[in-house]
Regions:
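Amphipathic alpha-helices of TPR/Sel1-like and other helical repeat/solenoid scaffolds
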Residues: 1-9, 31-32, 48-55
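Short, solvent-exposed segments of well-ordered alpha helices
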Residues: 16-20, 39, 64
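Non-membrane alpha-helical segments in proteins
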Residues: 23-38, 74-75
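Alpha-helical scaffold segments of alpha-solenoid architecture
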Residues: 41, 46-184
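Internal amphipathic alpha-helical repeat/solenoid segments
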Residues: 1-28
Length: 184
């Protein structure tokens, strides 16, 4: 479908027909963003997000607001957090108008970042079960894994040895099987 977009002659829109083409193009990239995430293809996710964000930013006030806009923006913020791209995360947050910061899809990554700064790892774990869209689970899991790896690195330096039961609690895992999978 993205190849077919190259046949659209009028981007940006200058007539109602052009506007329909732009809306269709935006939707193709939105769905491509979700599809890339579903496939676990982070590079495609980044590419599609970058393209669809152009439609959100450059055509603001020209095209109607997409119903998927905040879901996708929130996903991108989660991506930045989960891959420890903190300065880029803060740059993106600053670009979001204040009125839109209260959107549920934007609040999730903002809350996670706040919990992380506070060291409230239990709140991060509990937020795993309260996602506003199923696609958020992918990056929340990545974020939790990243935290666990940081805790593991610190524990490696701090302890000469540690009991498996204590390690399970330290890494916020609910059972021995999860701990074994994490260690592997």
């Amino acid at each position: 479908m993205r190849i077919d977009l190259t046949f659209f002659e009028n981007l940006p829109p200058t007539s109602p027909v052009d506007m329909r083409e732009c809306i269709l193009a935006r939707e193709v990239y939105e769905y491509s963003t979700f599809l890339a995430l579903e496939k676990g293809d982070i590079e495609s996710f980044e590419r599609n997000f970058t393209t669809v964000k152009t439609y959100y930013d450059e055509f603001d006030g020209i095209l109607p607001v997409s119903q998927k806009k905040f879901t996708i923006l929130g996903l991108y913020l989660l991506y930045l957090l989960s891959f420890n791209k903190i300065s880029e995360y803060h740059t993106e947050i600053e670009l979001i108008p204040i009125a839109e910061l209260s959107n549920v899809f934007i609040k999730v990554p903002m809350s996670l970042e706040q919990y992380f700064v506070e060291g409230s790892y239990n709140k991060i774990l509990s937020s795993k079960h309260n996602v506003p869209h199923p696609a958020y689970q992918f990056f929340i899991d990545k974020f939790i894994d990243a935290i666990r790896y940081e805790v593991a690195r610190s524990a490696e330096r701090a302890y000469e040895s540690i009991a498996m039961k204590d390690m399970q609690g330290l890494f916020m895992l609910s059972n021995q099987g999860e701990l074994s999978a994490f260690i592997d």
